Design a protein with these regions (language model features):
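Conserved N-terminal entry element of GNAT/NAT acetyltransferase domains
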Residues: 1-18
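A short, polar/charged loop-to-alpha-helix boundary motif
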Residues: 78-84
Length: 106
């Protein structure tokens, strides 16, 4: 039986940081993400920069203990609704899971 784990990423956790960078870089290299790898300078600074932002958070998904997806989010505020909101900046699913229904939880 498969296992699914969803966690709020700790930007200072080396394993979670590596998983975040690997998933995001995979997305960046896909045509949907621009078709180019993240620049080395971005890879070197992204985790520290995200950690400095109190309104940033990343949710990581693991399937069978392997990184399967992420969502990068930023807290904001809607002036039209006068309420807080979550801006979803990146949504990534590992290419190995694209088109697969073996993980359907319905």
């Amino acid at each position: 039986m498969m296992s699914i784990e969803i966690v709020i990423a700790d930007y200072q956790n080396p394993a979670q940081g590596n998983d975040l960078l690997m998933l995001l870089d995979g997305y960046a290299q896909d045509p949907m993400g621009g078709g180019e790898a993240l620049p080395p300078a971005v890879k070197a600074s992204l985790l520290a920069e995200l950690a400095r932002l109190p309104h940033a958070f990343t949710v990581l998904a693991y399937v069978d203990n392997k990184p399967a997806g992420l969502i990068n989010c930023f807290l904001g505020f809607s002036t039209f609704a006068a309420k807080p909101l979550v801006n979803i900046h990146d949504v990534v699913v590992s290419a190995s899971l694209w088109g697969s229904d073996q993980y359907y939880i319905g």
